[in-house]
Structures are given as C-alpha cells and as structure tokens.
C-alpha cells in the first residue's frame, strides 16, 4: 500500500519506527482502560480524573524534553488542579478499580503525548496518524479475535453513519 501526502513523500517514511510502535502500544490500552473506567464510574468522575493529563504531561516535558515551566503555565495548572478537586471532591469519591483504570489511562495517554511531540519534530501529522492507525488496527484485530461479537444490522447502520459523518466533519477541517 502506498499512500502519499500533498508533498509527494510517502506517508510511511520515518526514522521513528520504534517510537510509533511504542506510541500505539500505549495508546490502545489507554483507550481500553478509559472506556472500562467509564463503565465502572460516572462519566463526570472519569472525565475529571482524566484532567490530570496536563499535570503529568508538564512534568514529563520538563524531565524528558527539557521544557521550562513559566508562571502563566504554573497558574493555569494550579487552576486546573483546583477545578479537578472541586469535581472529584476528595474523600467523597470512592476509590475503586474504575478510578485506578482512569488514572492508568491518563498516565499512558500522557506518555503518548510526549512521544508524539518528539516524533512531530520530523514526521508530518499524516505520517503520525497513519502509523498510529495502522498499528492500532493490527492490535485491535488481535484482541477482536478473542472477543468479537457481530453487531446487529441496526448497530451496523448506526456505525456506518457515524463513520460517514465523522469523516465528512473531519474533512471540513482541511478545506
């Protein structure tokens, strides 16, 4: 399969094969953990827990990318943390498997963001997305072999239109 972007370079040309692979290896379980957390806890709690991502990304960016934290970013992080605490109300939220899943998902997603930033210096967005989707499709297929349940015809219709409208909306971004 040969896909080309607008600059006529092949999309799969990269010097970061291991990073793309690692990104996908972390991205898929991150999503699976988050979706599992949504089943086990209210959506507002899972979403509030996911707001820890900017804090983790900032710490990782300082440690691994050498980025600096300036006063405005620090202020925004503190406000975000306060907002997260208001939503979660520490002491009231029950610590459960869902909470741990949401936290693990957030940590993995933070690493994915850092890896993406390092790859984005050399690879185009299309290359990053192509590798991510290719690897995740392969990994998802392997998982599906063990857990596949054929959707009903009505569900297939819904999925078709969700894909169609999602693709149309995303294509409008590039017009």
Placement of each model-derived feature along the sequence:
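Hydrophobic transmembrane alpha-helices of multi-pass small-molecule transport proteins
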Residues: 72-88
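C-terminal transmembrane-helix exit sites in multi-pass transporters
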Residues: 36, 53-75, 147
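Membrane-interface helix caps and helix-loop-helix hairpins in membrane proteins
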Residues: 38-41, 89-96, 146-153
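Structural motif at transmembrane-helix junctions in multi-pass transporters
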Residues: 33-50, 121-126, 172-173
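Transmembrane alpha-helices of multi-pass small-molecule transport proteins
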Residues: 4-29, 108-112, 131-146
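Conserved small/polar residues in nucleotide/adenosyl-binding loops
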Residues: 1-5, 174-175
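Loop-to-transmembrane-helix transition segments
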Residues: 8-33, 97-105, 150-169
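Transmembrane alpha-helical segments that form core, pore/gating elements
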Residues: 93-148
């Amino acid at each position: 399969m040969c896909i080309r972007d607008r600059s006529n370079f092949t999309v799969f040309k990269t010097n970061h094969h291991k990073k793309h692979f690692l990104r996908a290896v972390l991205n898929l379980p991150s999503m699976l953990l988050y979706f599992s957390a949504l089943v086990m806890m209210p959506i507002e709690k899972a979403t509030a827990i996911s707001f820890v991502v900017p804090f983790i990304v900032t710490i990782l960016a300082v440690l691994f990318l050498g980025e600096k934290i300036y006063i405005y970013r620090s202020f925004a992080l503190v406000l975000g943390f306060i907002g997260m605490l208001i939503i979660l109300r520490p002491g009231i939220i029950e610590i459960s498997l869902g909470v741990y899943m949401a936290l693990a998902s957030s940590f993995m997603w933070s690493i994915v963001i850092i890896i993406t930033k390092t790859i984005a210096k050399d690879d185009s967005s299309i290359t990053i997305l192509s590798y991510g989707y290719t690897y995740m499709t392969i990994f998802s297929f392997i998982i599906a072999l063990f857990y596949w349940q054929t959707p009903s015809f009505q569900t297939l219709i819904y999925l078709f239109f969700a894909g169609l409208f999602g693709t149309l909306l995303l294509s409008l971004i590039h017009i």
